[in-house]
Amino acid sequence: MKIIKRSGTEVTFDIDKIVNAIRAANLEVEESSRLTDRQVVYAAQNVAEACENAGHTVSVEEIQDLVEDEIMRLDCYEVARHYIIYRYVQSLKRQKNTTDDKILSLIECNNEEVKQENSNKNPTVNSVQRDYMAGEISKDLTQRVLLPQEIVDAHNEGLIHFHDSDYFAQHMHNCDLVNLEDMLQNGTVISGTLIEKPHSFSTACNIATQIIAQVASSQYGGQSISLTHLAPFVEVSRQKIRGEVARELEELGVSASAEKVREVVEDRLRDEIRRGVQTIQYQVVTLMTTNGQAPFVTVFMYLNEARTPQEKHDLAMIVEETLRQRYEGVKNEAGVWITPAFPKLIYVLEDDNVYENSPYFYLTQLAAKCTAKRMVPDYISEKKMRELKLSKGETAGNGDCYTCMGCRSFLTPDRSGNGFNNVANALNYDPNKPKYYGRFNQGVVTINLPDVALSSHQDMDKFWKIFDERLELCHRALLCRHERLMGTLSDAAPILWQYGALARLKKGETIDRLLVGGYSTISLGYAGLYECVKYMTGHSHTEKEGTPFAMAVMQRMNDKCAEWKAASDIDFSLYGTPLESTTYKFAKCLQRRFGIIPGVTDKGYITNSYHVHVSEEIDAFDKLKFEGMFQQLSPGGAISYVEVPNMQDNLKAVIRVMQYIYDNIMYAELNTKSDYCQVCGYDGEIKIVEDDGKLVWECPNCGNRDQEKMNVARRTCGYIGTQFWNQGRTEEIRDRVLHL
């Protein structure tokens, strides 16, 4: 059995250390108040048994909590008091330097917590380690200097989660929609070099990847770009190629019909589109940003975003090539085609591509084929989104359709009625269009809903009182995020604030006016709605006895966001948090505070946002229909999914699910398995098995358990992860049931 030390390193459990610790405290009290040797060993054995049954790799802090409980259970309160004093003294000693051990264990690749924190970072690589080292320093500064103690304590106890404290020391924001159109059409500056409007599609793609890398290095959250912004350069290349063909024919003294010339031009154009799309795919997965990872970038594919029929035709060619190349995948170091994590693709389901007789249905068929093999694209319903996202003056069904920022964070609709009066000085400003590209999110703080419920002891009046108190705590924490960004100079990230990605401010100008008035958002996250409802009502939120309470919880959070927004002119918005490593942290905190409660705290994870519990039997269509209700109440960020088996031979069923998404839910994805064993060549699902109390990945064909010799891709938190996960998230992945 393994345990995790405070430094994050994983070591073998040693019962003798528990025995010795209890004996040391025992010797500090009078003989008449001491435990017998038999009681000492009995207590240690009970602790060991509790660790075995915990369902996850326990930490030193958890073990010490168990020791305290055991001593007090034996009515030796004086011994327990001395043990608590000993822990307190050791804690004070550790506070003198909170980072050295963590950083040293990180460098030596012994820090298990860091190894499993981010499923898209490889913590053995020098550049990643440097980012993690900086992150540990930032976390330390955040907790000791930058945040009020009440926020720090609430975060450490798992009442709330203050996200991305490893970047909070700097003046950095979360995620955004890159105004790629402005940068490509009107020029930008990268690393002090002027980049003018490109003269071909392939050059535009190359510049786009440089912009993606620069943006990723200037923020900590995801970014999104639209293929629509690249579409005009298809016509630029078409005209350029047409001129080249004409010159070649003239030089050869050959004449050709207009139709033949058109065929040659279009063939060469498609080849250039292929090369341009390939540039984006390979650059994105091979670039290393200052965050120690490939850029978290989402590529948006929305045909109705095109301005003219010709541009829409050209955009369709780009979308087609993007889907074809993603279906193919990328080669791993052994030359085997595998599923890449990035870029994330979002395909908009529209009236002209979703049904069999629609003109762009061939793209939807290709998207279905790609999803069945590579788990992308994800799907946004134009129909449902235009019902929900209403800018000033718009009516239901005539609203806006736009991409999320990264994996799931959505901007609030444009409430200005004039594109925010071009507060960002964009050169592609149109006062008659709602403004989305160039806007961003300031950050997230998440409330632990199961903790609110458990703290109330099933007393409804007490629940709402505690809920309001915790929400106000989140509010104060979010204001800390907002105030950290206030006063930030545009010089802090020129690519973002001066050269068009988000704004074109002057040097030395602050970004303050972009933080209010609705231009940017700030997110109240939530997690564990299922566990919260289960504890308070005894029912899943999918059952009629639990659904009304779940909806009331969601509405209360929306009401609070509206209240805070009215008071401050900051766009607070409710966000379904994509817990990755934090799901494990919250679960451990709940077990520490409330013990093991069947159906509520008996897992190493809690359920993301409003989702149906991963182990609950429900079919794909019922799940999407049910969760669609909650997406309406999660306007700042939401994504739903269905787990499916290998669907490569049943694409009609995939398309049926996609059509159901179009009619019933704004944003959803299909999860399948796409793994490869480098030892035996097995191509299928790598299984999760238990080994000495720890969950490990194992090839079902040859038994290989070496994570360095397998490629595993699983959807976690809206992105595809490929670097493995902590024990809590791994347990959640194991427990997922199929919905189709």
PLM feature spans:
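Charged, amphipathic alpha-helical regulatory modules used
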Residues: 1-109, 734-739
